Amino acid sequence: MSRRHRTFPVKVGSVTIGGTAPVTIQSMTNTDTKDTEKTLAQIKDLVEAGCQLVRVAIPDEESVNSFKTLTQFSPVPLIADIHFSYQLAIKAIEAGASKIRINPGNIGSRQRVAKVVEKAKTHNVPIRVGINSGSVEKNLLQKYGGPTPSALVESAVNNVMMLSEMGFGDVVVSIKASDVNTTVKANQEFATRLPNPLHLGITEAGTIKQGTIKSSVGIGTLLSHGIGDTLRVSLSGSPIEEVSVARGILSSLNLAEGPRIVSCPTCARSNISVEDLASTVEDRLKDLNTSLTVAVMGCEVNGPGEAKEADIGIAGSKEYGVLFKKGKIIDRVPKNQLLEVLSRAIDEYIDEIHSK
Protein backbone atom coordinates (compact mmCIF):
# COMPACT_ATOMS: atom_id res chain seq x y z
CA MET A 1 0.00 0.00 0.00
CA SER A 2 1.26 3.45 -0.92
CA ARG A 3 0.83 6.38 1.38
CA ARG A 4 -2.55 7.98 0.83
CA HIS A 5 -2.63 10.86 -1.62
CA ARG A 6 -3.36 14.12 0.16
CA THR A 7 -6.69 15.76 -0.65
CA PHE A 8 -8.68 18.43 1.13
CA PRO A 9 -11.76 17.46 3.16
CA VAL A 10 -15.30 18.09 1.96
CA LYS A 11 -18.27 17.82 4.32
CA VAL A 12 -21.31 16.00 2.99
CA GLY A 13 -23.81 16.44 5.77
CA SER A 14 -22.36 14.52 8.72
CA VAL A 15 -19.86 12.61 6.54
CA THR A 16 -16.41 13.86 5.53
CA ILE A 17 -14.88 12.92 2.19
CA GLY A 18 -11.14 13.41 1.76
CA GLY A 19 -8.49 14.74 4.08
CA THR A 20 -7.70 12.19 6.76
CA ALA A 21 -11.24 10.74 6.79
CA PRO A 22 -11.64 7.01 6.09
CA VAL A 23 -12.65 6.00 2.57
CA THR A 24 -16.44 6.03 2.46
CA ILE A 25 -18.86 3.72 0.66
CA GLN A 26 -21.61 5.04 -1.57
CA SER A 27 -24.36 3.45 -3.59
CA MET A 28 -27.37 4.61 -5.56
CA THR A 29 -31.03 3.70 -5.31
CA ASN A 30 -32.57 1.95 -8.31
CA THR A 31 -36.19 2.43 -7.27
CA ASP A 32 -38.52 5.00 -8.81
CA THR A 33 -37.66 8.11 -6.80
CA LYS A 34 -41.30 9.16 -6.93
CA ASP A 35 -42.15 6.05 -4.90
CA THR A 36 -41.07 7.58 -1.61
CA GLU A 37 -41.89 4.58 0.56
CA LYS A 38 -40.02 2.05 -1.58
CA THR A 39 -37.03 4.37 -2.05
CA LEU A 40 -36.74 5.09 1.66
CA ALA A 41 -36.91 1.37 2.40
CA GLN A 42 -34.04 0.75 0.00
CA ILE A 43 -32.00 3.58 1.52
CA LYS A 44 -32.40 1.97 4.94
CA ASP A 45 -31.41 -1.43 3.52
CA LEU A 46 -28.29 0.12 2.00
CA VAL A 47 -27.34 1.74 5.28
CA GLU A 48 -27.83 -1.54 7.12
CA ALA A 49 -25.50 -3.18 4.58
CA GLY A 50 -22.79 -0.62 5.33
CA CYS A 51 -23.47 2.28 2.96
CA GLN A 52 -22.53 5.71 4.32
CA LEU A 53 -23.82 7.97 1.54
CA VAL A 54 -26.71 7.30 -0.83
CA ARG A 55 -27.28 8.91 -4.21
CA VAL A 56 -30.77 9.35 -5.62
CA ALA A 57 -31.64 10.21 -9.22
CA ILE A 58 -33.76 13.33 -9.71
CA PRO A 59 -35.16 13.10 -13.26
CA ASP A 60 -38.22 15.35 -12.84
CA GLU A 61 -40.15 17.75 -10.61
CA GLU A 62 -42.21 15.03 -8.96
CA SER A 63 -39.01 13.32 -7.89
CA VAL A 64 -37.88 16.52 -6.20
CA ASN A 65 -41.00 16.46 -4.02
CA SER A 66 -40.29 12.88 -2.99
CA PHE A 67 -36.60 13.68 -2.46
CA LYS A 68 -37.53 16.38 0.04
CA THR A 69 -39.33 13.79 2.16
CA LEU A 70 -36.47 11.33 1.77
CA THR A 71 -33.93 13.85 3.10
CA GLN A 72 -36.05 14.28 6.22
CA PHE A 73 -36.16 10.57 7.06
CA SER A 74 -32.94 9.15 5.63
CA PRO A 75 -30.45 7.90 8.26
CA VAL A 76 -27.53 9.08 6.09
CA PRO A 77 -26.83 12.13 3.90
CA LEU A 78 -28.42 11.98 0.46
CA ILE A 79 -26.83 13.04 -2.81
CA ALA A 80 -28.98 14.32 -5.66
CA ASP A 81 -27.98 12.98 -9.08
CA ILE A 82 -28.74 15.59 -11.74
CA HIS A 83 -28.43 15.54 -15.50
CA PHE A 84 -29.26 18.26 -18.03
CA SER A 85 -31.54 20.46 -15.88
CA TYR A 86 -29.99 23.22 -13.81
CA GLN A 87 -33.46 23.98 -12.40
CA LEU A 88 -33.67 20.48 -10.92
CA ALA A 89 -30.22 20.93 -9.39
CA ILE A 90 -31.35 24.12 -7.69
CA LYS A 91 -34.59 22.55 -6.46
CA ALA A 92 -32.77 19.48 -5.16
CA ILE A 93 -30.51 21.71 -3.08
CA GLU A 94 -33.55 23.52 -1.72
CA ALA A 95 -35.13 20.12 -0.96
CA GLY A 96 -32.27 19.21 1.37
CA ALA A 97 -29.57 17.50 -0.70
CA SER A 98 -26.32 17.11 1.22
CA LYS A 99 -24.42 17.07 -2.09
CA ILE A 100 -25.30 17.24 -5.76
CA ARG A 101 -23.71 15.34 -8.60
CA ILE A 102 -23.60 17.16 -11.92
CA ASN A 103 -21.65 17.16 -15.13
CA PRO A 104 -21.33 20.89 -15.82
CA GLY A 105 -20.92 20.05 -19.50
CA ASN A 106 -24.52 18.86 -19.84
CA ILE A 107 -26.17 21.36 -17.49
CA GLY A 108 -26.06 24.09 -20.12
CA SER A 109 -24.44 27.49 -20.36
CA ARG A 110 -21.90 28.90 -17.93
CA GLN A 111 -24.64 31.19 -16.63
CA ARG A 112 -26.79 28.20 -15.72
CA VAL A 113 -23.91 26.51 -13.94
CA ALA A 114 -23.32 29.77 -12.05
CA LYS A 115 -26.92 29.71 -10.80
CA VAL A 116 -26.44 26.19 -9.44
CA VAL A 117 -23.16 27.21 -7.81
CA GLU A 118 -24.76 30.23 -6.16
CA LYS A 119 -27.50 28.07 -4.66
CA ALA A 120 -24.94 25.50 -3.48
CA LYS A 121 -22.92 28.27 -1.81
CA THR A 122 -25.98 29.59 -0.01
CA HIS A 123 -26.83 26.15 1.39
CA ASN A 124 -23.23 24.97 1.98
CA VAL A 125 -23.80 22.03 -0.34
CA PRO A 126 -20.75 20.52 -2.09
CA ILE A 127 -20.76 19.52 -5.73
CA ARG A 128 -19.40 16.39 -7.34
CA VAL A 129 -18.16 16.98 -10.84
CA GLY A 130 -18.85 13.68 -12.56
CA ILE A 131 -16.82 13.10 -15.71
CA ASN A 132 -17.68 9.96 -17.70
CA SER A 133 -16.09 8.67 -20.87
CA GLY A 134 -19.45 8.88 -22.61
CA SER A 135 -19.99 12.57 -21.93
CA VAL A 136 -16.64 14.23 -22.66
CA GLU A 137 -16.88 17.55 -24.51
CA LYS A 138 -16.65 17.26 -28.31
CA ASN A 139 -13.66 19.58 -28.59
CA LEU A 140 -11.67 17.36 -26.21
CA LEU A 141 -12.68 14.22 -28.09
CA GLN A 142 -11.37 15.81 -31.27
CA LYS A 143 -8.21 17.05 -29.58
CA TYR A 144 -7.28 13.66 -28.11
CA GLY A 145 -8.89 11.37 -30.67
CA GLY A 146 -11.45 9.94 -28.26
CA PRO A 147 -12.20 9.62 -24.52
CA THR A 148 -8.59 9.00 -23.55
CA PRO A 149 -7.33 9.40 -19.97
CA SER A 150 -5.90 12.81 -20.86
CA ALA A 151 -9.21 13.93 -22.36
CA LEU A 152 -11.06 12.90 -19.20
CA VAL A 153 -8.54 14.65 -16.97
CA GLU A 154 -8.61 17.87 -18.98
CA SER A 155 -12.41 17.87 -18.82
CA ALA A 156 -12.31 17.40 -15.05
CA VAL A 157 -9.67 20.08 -14.50
CA ASN A 158 -11.51 22.55 -16.73
CA ASN A 159 -14.75 22.05 -14.83
CA VAL A 160 -13.09 22.34 -11.42
CA MET A 161 -11.36 25.54 -12.56
CA MET A 162 -14.65 26.96 -13.84
CA LEU A 163 -16.29 26.39 -10.45
CA SER A 164 -13.21 27.86 -8.75
CA GLU A 165 -13.53 31.01 -10.89
CA MET A 166 -17.07 31.28 -9.55
CA GLY A 167 -15.70 31.22 -6.01
CA PHE A 168 -16.71 27.63 -5.31
CA GLY A 169 -14.20 25.14 -3.93
CA ASP A 170 -16.14 22.33 -2.21
CA VAL A 171 -15.78 20.05 -5.21
CA VAL A 172 -15.41 16.28 -5.26
CA VAL A 173 -14.35 14.81 -8.60
CA SER A 174 -15.11 11.50 -10.27
CA ILE A 175 -13.50 10.34 -13.50
CA LYS A 176 -15.01 7.10 -14.74
CA ALA A 177 -14.91 4.92 -17.81
CA SER A 178 -16.17 1.41 -18.43
CA ASP A 179 -12.59 0.52 -19.36
CA VAL A 180 -10.50 -0.23 -16.27
CA ASN A 181 -7.15 0.97 -17.64
CA THR A 182 -8.62 4.27 -18.81
CA THR A 183 -10.18 4.88 -15.40
CA VAL A 184 -7.00 4.03 -13.51
CA LYS A 185 -4.72 6.17 -15.70
CA ALA A 186 -7.10 9.14 -15.64
CA ASN A 187 -7.44 9.14 -11.86
CA GLN A 188 -3.70 8.73 -11.40
CA GLU A 189 -3.06 11.70 -13.67
CA PHE A 190 -5.71 13.87 -12.01
CA ALA A 191 -4.26 13.10 -8.57
CA THR A 192 -1.01 14.76 -9.66
CA ARG A 193 -2.83 17.87 -10.85
CA LEU A 194 -5.35 18.93 -8.20
CA PRO A 195 -6.01 18.12 -4.51
CA ASN A 196 -9.77 17.59 -4.81
CA PRO A 197 -11.18 14.46 -3.15
CA LEU A 198 -11.69 11.66 -5.64
CA HIS A 199 -14.79 9.51 -5.95
CA LEU A 200 -13.78 6.16 -7.49
CA GLY A 201 -15.77 3.82 -9.68
CA ILE A 202 -15.95 1.98 -12.98
CA THR A 203 -18.99 3.22 -14.87
CA GLU A 204 -21.31 0.72 -16.56
CA ALA A 205 -19.16 -2.05 -15.09
CA GLY A 206 -21.68 -4.74 -16.00
CA THR A 207 -23.34 -7.69 -14.31
CA ILE A 208 -22.61 -8.71 -10.74
CA LYS A 209 -19.86 -11.11 -11.80
CA GLN A 210 -18.25 -8.95 -14.49
CA GLY A 211 -18.78 -5.72 -12.58
CA THR A 212 -17.29 -7.12 -9.39
CA ILE A 213 -14.15 -8.16 -11.26
CA LYS A 214 -13.71 -4.84 -13.09
CA SER A 215 -14.50 -2.74 -10.02
CA SER A 216 -12.22 -4.73 -7.75
CA VAL A 217 -9.31 -4.42 -10.17
CA GLY A 218 -9.84 -0.74 -11.01
CA ILE A 219 -10.84 0.63 -7.62
CA GLY A 220 -8.45 -1.70 -5.80
CA THR A 221 -5.51 -0.60 -7.95
CA LEU A 222 -6.15 3.07 -7.25
CA LEU A 223 -6.70 2.57 -3.52
CA SER A 224 -3.53 0.49 -3.25
CA HIS A 225 -1.66 3.47 -4.69
CA GLY A 226 -3.20 5.79 -2.12
CA ILE A 227 -5.69 7.37 -4.52
CA GLY A 228 -9.38 7.67 -3.66
CA ASP A 229 -11.55 9.07 -0.89
CA THR A 230 -14.96 7.54 -1.56
CA LEU A 231 -16.23 4.84 -3.89
CA ARG A 232 -19.26 3.41 -5.56
CA VAL A 233 -19.25 -0.04 -7.15
CA SER A 234 -21.60 0.07 -10.14
CA LEU A 235 -23.39 -3.21 -10.85
CA SER A 236 -26.36 -4.21 -12.98
CA GLY A 237 -28.20 -5.68 -10.04
CA SER A 238 -29.14 -4.99 -6.46
CA PRO A 239 -27.39 -1.96 -4.95
CA ILE A 240 -27.00 -4.05 -1.80
CA GLU A 241 -24.50 -6.14 -3.78
CA GLU A 242 -22.65 -2.94 -4.63
CA VAL A 243 -22.13 -2.22 -0.95
CA SER A 244 -21.05 -5.78 -0.25
CA VAL A 245 -18.39 -5.65 -2.97
CA ALA A 246 -17.25 -2.20 -1.82
CA ARG A 247 -16.83 -3.44 1.73
CA GLY A 248 -14.87 -6.40 0.45
CA ILE A 249 -12.52 -4.17 -1.54
CA LEU A 250 -11.81 -1.95 1.47
CA SER A 251 -11.45 -4.87 3.86
CA SER A 252 -9.04 -6.70 1.56
CA LEU A 253 -6.79 -3.62 1.57
CA ASN A 254 -7.14 -3.16 5.35
CA LEU A 255 -8.92 0.15 4.76
CA ALA A 256 -12.03 -0.89 6.68
CA GLU A 257 -13.08 -3.29 9.40
CA GLY A 258 -14.59 -6.52 8.20
CA PRO A 259 -14.16 -10.28 7.96
CA ARG A 260 -11.86 -12.05 5.53
CA ILE A 261 -12.42 -15.66 4.54
CA VAL A 262 -9.36 -17.71 3.62
CA SER A 263 -10.12 -21.01 1.91
CA CYS A 264 -8.07 -23.40 -0.18
CA PRO A 265 -8.85 -24.15 -3.85
CA THR A 266 -9.24 -27.85 -2.90
CA CYS A 267 -7.50 -30.88 -4.35
CA ALA A 268 -7.52 -34.66 -3.90
CA ARG A 269 -6.38 -34.21 -0.29
CA SER A 270 -9.58 -32.38 0.73
CA ASN A 271 -11.49 -34.19 3.43
CA ILE A 272 -14.35 -31.72 3.90
CA SER A 273 -16.66 -29.73 1.62
CA VAL A 274 -14.58 -26.55 1.57
CA GLU A 275 -16.81 -24.66 -0.86
CA ASP A 276 -20.02 -25.26 1.10
CA LEU A 277 -18.46 -24.53 4.48
CA ALA A 278 -16.61 -21.41 3.31
CA SER A 279 -19.75 -20.05 1.61
CA THR A 280 -21.82 -20.62 4.75
CA VAL A 281 -19.22 -18.91 6.95
CA GLU A 282 -18.95 -16.01 4.51
CA ASP A 283 -22.73 -15.53 4.53
CA ARG A 284 -22.92 -15.65 8.34
CA LEU A 285 -20.19 -13.03 8.70
CA LYS A 286 -21.24 -10.68 5.90
CA ASP A 287 -22.58 -8.00 8.27
CA LEU A 288 -19.69 -8.20 10.74
CA ASN A 289 -17.83 -4.92 11.27
CA THR A 290 -14.89 -6.50 13.09
CA SER A 291 -11.57 -7.34 11.44
CA LEU A 292 -11.34 -11.11 11.56
CA THR A 293 -9.65 -13.69 9.34
CA VAL A 294 -11.32 -17.10 9.21
CA ALA A 295 -9.79 -20.06 7.37
CA VAL A 296 -11.59 -23.05 5.91
CA MET A 297 -9.04 -25.58 4.67
CA GLY A 298 -9.55 -29.00 3.14
CA CYS A 299 -6.71 -30.83 4.85
CA GLU A 300 -4.05 -30.48 7.52
CA VAL A 301 -1.43 -29.63 4.92
CA ASN A 302 -3.12 -26.31 4.24
CA GLY A 303 -4.55 -25.79 7.70
CA PRO A 304 -3.27 -24.82 10.11
CA GLY A 305 0.13 -24.73 8.40
CA GLU A 306 -0.49 -22.50 5.38
CA ALA A 307 -3.33 -20.69 7.15
CA LYS A 308 -1.45 -20.00 10.37
CA GLU A 309 -2.06 -16.26 10.03
CA ALA A 310 -5.81 -16.78 10.38
CA ASP A 311 -7.42 -15.80 13.67
CA ILE A 312 -9.67 -18.86 13.66
CA GLY A 313 -9.86 -21.76 11.25
CA ILE A 314 -10.92 -25.30 10.53
CA ALA A 315 -9.35 -28.07 8.48
CA GLY A 316 -10.37 -31.57 7.53
CA SER A 317 -8.54 -34.83 8.07
CA LYS A 318 -9.48 -38.40 7.18
CA GLU A 319 -11.09 -39.19 10.53
CA TYR A 320 -12.04 -35.83 12.06
CA GLY A 321 -11.88 -32.08 11.71
CA VAL A 322 -9.55 -29.73 13.53
CA LEU A 323 -10.16 -26.28 14.94
CA PHE A 324 -7.16 -24.00 15.12
CA LYS A 325 -6.41 -20.53 16.42
CA LYS A 326 -3.42 -18.49 15.25
CA GLY A 327 -1.90 -21.63 13.72
CA LYS A 328 -2.29 -23.85 16.79
CA ILE A 329 -4.74 -26.75 16.93
CA ILE A 330 -7.09 -26.26 19.88
CA ASP A 331 -9.68 -28.99 19.25
CA ARG A 332 -10.49 -32.10 17.22
CA VAL A 333 -14.14 -32.76 16.47
CA PRO A 334 -16.32 -34.94 14.22
CA LYS A 335 -16.42 -33.42 10.75
CA ASN A 336 -20.19 -33.00 10.85
CA GLN A 337 -19.76 -30.67 13.84
CA LEU A 338 -17.10 -28.43 12.30
CA LEU A 339 -19.44 -25.61 11.33
CA GLU A 340 -21.10 -25.51 14.75
CA VAL A 341 -17.74 -25.56 16.55
CA LEU A 342 -16.28 -22.91 14.25
CA SER A 343 -19.29 -20.61 14.71
CA ARG A 344 -18.99 -20.87 18.48
CA ALA A 345 -15.24 -20.21 18.35
CA ILE A 346 -15.79 -17.14 16.16
CA ASP A 347 -18.35 -15.72 18.61
CA GLU A 348 -15.95 -16.29 21.50
CA TYR A 349 -13.08 -14.67 19.62
CA ILE A 350 -15.17 -11.60 18.79
CA ASP A 351 -16.20 -11.33 22.44
CA GLU A 352 -12.51 -11.44 23.39
CA ILE A 353 -11.73 -8.60 21.00
CA HIS A 354 -14.58 -6.42 22.24
CA SER A 355 -13.76 -7.04 25.91
CA LYS A 356 -10.23 -5.67 25.55
Swiss-Prot record:
It comes from the Bacteria. It catalyses: (2E)-4-hydroxy-3-methylbut-2-enyl diphosphate + oxidized [flavodoxin] + H2O + 2 H(+) = 2-C-methyl-D-erythritol 2,4-cyclic diphosphate + reduced [flavodoxin]. Signal peptide: none annotated. [4Fe-4S] cluster binds at C264, C267, C299, E306. The keyword Iron-sulfur applies. Keywords: 4Fe-4S, Iron, Iron-sulfur, Isoprene biosynthesis, Metal-binding, Oxidoreductase. Pathway: Isoprenoid biosynthesis; isopentenyl diphosphate biosynthesis via DXP pathway; isopentenyl diphosphate from 1-deoxy-D-xylulose 5-phosphate: step 5/6. InterPro entries: Dihydropteroate_synth-like_sf, IspG_bac, IspG_bac-typ, NO2/SO3_Rdtase_4Fe4S_sf. One of its GO terms (molecular function) is 4-hydroxy-3-methylbut-2-en-1-yl diphosphate synthase activity (ferredoxin). Binds 1 [4Fe-4S] cluster. Its cofactor is [4Fe-4S] cluster. GO terms for biological process: isopentenyl diphosphate biosynthetic process, methylerythritol 4-phosphate pathway; terpenoid biosynthetic process. Its EC number is 1.17.7.3. PANTHER family: 4-HYDROXY-3-METHYLBUT-2-EN-1-YL DIPHOSPHATE SYNTHASE (PTHR30454), 4-HYDROXY-3-METHYLBUT-2-EN-1-YL DIPHOSPHATE SYNTHASE (FERREDOXIN), CHLOROPLASTIC (PTHR30454:SF0). Converts 2C-methyl-D-erythritol 2,4-cyclodiphosphate (ME-2,4cPP) into 1-hydroxy-2-methyl-2-(E)-butenyl 4-diphosphate. Belongs to the IspG family. This is 4-hydroxy-3-methylbut-2-en-1-yl diphosphate synthase (flavodoxin). It comes from Natranaerobius thermophilus (strain ATCC BAA-1301 / DSM 18059 / JW/NM-WN-LF).
